[in-house]
Design a protein with these regions (language model features):
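Long, C-terminal-biased catalytic regions of enzyme "large/alpha" subunits
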Residues: 1-274
Length: 274
């Protein structure tokens, strides 16, 4: 009960902050956004004079309340995550429903598009753990990693099957309508098995996944052009000059070396399914 009350209070604070920011953003001038206004990307923007405030043009935007570290919060409460603990799963689901209640309340209050989104937190995942570690110390399964697990995702290290991971995460998609993703991590050989990939897509569809992703490593040797899973050196020419392409969450971001340290640690911990 204390946890859910805290969720409600925090979500309310965020909703108020978003409204305050929205009120400030309305005072911006149309000429500050030449591309957006000139191409009518924001509905009604093309009709504004350059020195007019954007005002109601922003009403069609979204005020998103995001969250991350659902798994870590459940470990703090129950000593285990929601991947295998039904009690932890129920609590996390109730917490996200509570955020939705606040979003719905503020939709009605201000007639604006408040939404709940499952935050991927490419940059924040490491920053928040450092802040919390300074405040609360090193807590196993909570603040002892370099990152927080994304939104409602099962822990990336959790020994769980592909199907079970999808089933545990799927119900959260319906209550994070501002944005969500569920991904499964495959090893390099799985990409050759079209039938297995088709089965995964079918399970995602049947379980109600709104946005699903199937990740697999794509490595290329810059020296000889070999493509495949390359661990340390190219198996053909022994070169260490390797391009390692990975999906950070929902999109490709170039070479793995360009990721921040927290997300590199997370990628290393991901369970790869064969």
């Amino acid at each position: 009960e204390i946890f859910i009350e805290s969720i409600h209070e925090t979500a309310t604070l965020i909703a108020e902050q978003l409204y305050e920011r929205y009120q400030y953003q309305r005072t911006a001038l149309a000429r500050q956004f030449p591309f957006m206004m000139g191409n009518d990307v924001w509905k009604g923007g093309a009709a504004l004079n350059p020195n007019e405030q954007v005002g109601d043009v922003l009403r069609s935007g979204t005020l998103g309340i995001g969250f991350l570290g659902g798994h870590n919060a459940m470990v703090a409460l129950y000593g285990e995550g929601h991947g295998h603990s039904q009690k932890a799963w129920d609590t996390l689901y109730e917490a996200v429903l509570e955020i939705n209640k606040v979003a719905d309340e503020y939709k009605a209050k201000y007639n604006l598009n408040y939404s709940v989104l499952a935050t991927p937190a490419e940059g924040l995942s490491g920053r928040f753990t450092r802040m919390d570690r300074r405040k609360y110390g090193k807590i196993k399964g909570v603040t002892d990693n370099d990152y927080y697990v994304n939104s409602f995702h099962v822990d990336v290290k959790e020994p769980i099957s592909i199907v079970e991971k999808i089933k545990r995460e799927a119900p959260f998609h319906a209550i994070t309508r501002g944005g969500h993703i569920t991904y499964v991590e495959l090893d390099g050989e799985a990409q050759k098995n079209v039938r297995a990939i088709a089965k995964i897509v079918k399970v995602m569809f049947d379980e109600g996944i709104g946005y699903g992703s199937i990740n697999h490593p794509v490595d290329t040797c810059h020296n000889c052009g070999y493509k495949g899973v390359i661990y340390d050196k190219c198996p053909v020419c022994q070169s260490e000059n390797i391009l390692r392409m990975r999906r950070i969450t929902g999109y490709l971001t170039g070479d793995l070396s360009s990721w921040n340290s927290a997300k590199r640690a997370e990628e290393k911990d991901r369970v790869k399914h064969g």
